[in-house]
Amino acid sequence: MRILLTNDDGVHAEGLAVLERIARTLSDDVWIVAPETDQSGLAHSLTLSEPLRLRKVSDKHFALRGTPTDCVIMGIREVLPEKPDLVLSGVNAGANMADDVTYSGTIAGAIEGTLQGVRSFALSQAFSHGEGRVVPWEVAETYAPDLLRKLMNVDLPDGTFLNLNFPNCAPKDMQGVSVTGQGKLDFGLTVEERQDGRGLPYYWLRFGERLGTFREGTDIHALKHGKISVTPLKLDLTDYTVKDRVAQALGFGVAD
């Protein structure tokens, strides 16, 4: 089995090294094409206004001056000798759940793999920002290999990929696995204004306390209860329950 790895934290990120160790428990044919620099929060963007620069780090290990989407495209279309059997994106430092999935470059790596016709999974490791960015990578590294082996046997429809989030706990305290839906978060988003040396304003986007209802059956609820969350996500964003209402409002009758 040929596996392509990418991430959004960059080619030197600790989570990518963790993902490589996970992947090597599944196959000895593991390739990496990851961003040269941190691309967090760039979602499913791709580079069109400048060239992509590819650097070989070592055998089967490449850095690209581009986004996670660029990396998967280059990996599948240019770098690998043949199409991979699996794309793994991560392991992200921090959970990617609820509304976060639309911002996430980690999720985008799995989205692009899916668009390219390859089974794809995104992996993220939750941690507490109040603990000085101490990420419990051992949780993902301990449980991901067996979980991925099982998930490889799932018959996923075209356009669907899996989003895996690992809880912020010690491996011995992990409480199991839940198959979940997306939750809903209040971002607590603020805009912080500062001034540079010339007195000109600049801004930082900041997130405060992230509140939510943590409804049972959601990714947030699973992680809050020490469980691994596995969420099937699909590329088709159409809200089919609203199509007829929109069509009727426009005088078309029932939508096709």
From Swiss-Prot:
Tell me where the signal peptide lies.
none
Q: Provide one Gene Ontology cellular component.
A: cytoplasm
Textual note on the cofactor: Binds 1 divalent metal cation per subunit.
Question: Which amino acids does the record list as binding a divalent metal cation?
Answer: 8-9, 40, 92
- Could you tell me the EC number(s) of this protein? 3.1.3.5
Instruction: Kindly list the cofactors needed.
Output: a divalent metal cation
> Where is this chain's protein located in or outside the cell?
Cytoplasm
Keywords in alphabetical order: Cytoplasm, Hydrolase, Metal-binding, Nucleotide-binding
Is Hydrolase one of the keywords UniProt gives this record? yes
Gene3D superfamilies from the UniProt entry:
Survival protein SurE-like phosphatase/nucleotidase
Q: Name one GO molecular function term.
A: metal ion binding
* Record field: catalytic activity: a ribonucleoside 5'-phosphate + H2O = a ribonucleoside + phosphate
Primary enzyme class: hydrolase
Q: Which family, according to UniProt?
A: Belongs to the SurE nucleotidase family.
Q: Quote the function comment for this protein.
A: Nucleotidase that shows phosphatase activity on nucleoside 5'-monophosphates.
Q: What PANTHER family does the record point to?
A: 5'-NUCLEOTIDASE SURE (PTHR30457), 5'_3'-NUCLEOTIDASE SURE (PTHR30457:SF12)
Q: Please give the name of this protein.
A: 5'-nucleotidase SurE
Q: Which organism does this sequence originate in?
A: Agrobacterium fabrum (strain C58 / ATCC 33970) (Agrobacterium tumefaciens (strain C58))
